[in-house]
C-alpha cells in the first residue's frame, strides 16, 4: 500500500516539477520588456564607455607623442653635439638638451600618475563587455519564443552579467 502511495506522490511531484519547469521556461511580455530595457541600457553604457575611451586615448596621445619627439630629438642632439656645436656654445647646448630631457621626464611621470593608458584600456574593455550583453539579449529576443532559452534561466544569466558589469566597469 505504501508503494502505491509513494508512486502516486512521485508522479504528482514529477507533474508539479514539469509544470514548474514549463512555467519558468515560458516567456512573458514583462520579461521581454525588461530584457529590452537592459539591452538599451547596455547599448548606452557601451556608447558612454566608447566616448570615455576616446577621451582618454586623446589625453594619452597628448602626453605620449611629445615625450617621443623630445626623447628622439635629445638623443640625436646628444649624439651630434660634438660634430655640429662649436666649443664655445657646447655648455649652452648641453644645458638645453638636459632641460628638454628633464621636461620629457616630467611629462612621462605625469602620464604615469594620471594613468590615461590604463583608463583608456579599462573603458575599451567595458565597452566591449556591454556590447556583448546587448548583442546577447537582442539575439535571444529576436528568436521565436519556443526556440529561446528558458526565460528564468536567461533572465538570471543577464541579471548576473548586468550586475557584474555595473560593479566592475570604471566610472564614466
Q: Model-found features: residue ranges?
A:
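Conserved non-transmembrane functional hotspots
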Residues: 2-69, 80, 93, 99, ...
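Short, surface-exposed helix-loop/turn micro-motifs enriched in polar/charged residues
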Residues: 64, 87-88
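Juxtamembrane "helix exit" motif at the C-terminal ends of alpha-helical transmembrane segments
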Residues: 70-87
Amino acid at each position: 500500500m505504501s508503494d502505491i502511495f509513494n508512486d502516486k506522490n512521485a508522479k504528482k511531484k514529477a507533474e508539479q516539477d514539469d509544470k514548474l519547469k514549463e512555467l519558468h521556461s515560458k516567456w512573458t511580455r514583462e520579461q521581454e520588456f525588461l530584457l529590452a530595457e537592459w539591452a538599451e541600457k547596455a547599448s548606452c553604457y557601451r556608447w558612454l564607455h566608447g566616448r570615455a575611451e576616446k577621451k582618454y586615448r586623446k589625453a594619452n596621445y597628448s602626453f605620449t607623442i611629445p615625450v617621443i619627439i623630445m626623447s628622439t630629438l635629445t638623443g640625436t642632439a646628444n649624439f651630434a653635439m660634438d660634430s655640429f656645436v662649436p666649443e664655445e656654445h657646447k655648455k649652452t647646448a648641453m644645458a638645453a638638451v638636459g632641460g628638454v630631457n628633464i621636461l620629457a621626464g616630467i611629462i612621462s611621470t605625469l602620464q604615469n600618475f594620471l594613468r590615461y593608458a590604463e583608463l583608456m584600456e579599462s573603458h575599451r574593455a567595458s565597452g566591449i563587455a556591454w556590447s556583448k550583453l546587448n548583442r546577447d539579449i537582442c539575439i535571444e529576443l529576436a528568436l521565436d519564443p519556443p526556440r529561446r532559452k528558458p526565460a528564468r534561466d536567461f533572465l538570471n544569466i543577464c541579471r548576473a552579467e548586468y550586475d557584474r558589469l555595473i560593479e566592475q566597469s570604471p566610472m564614466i
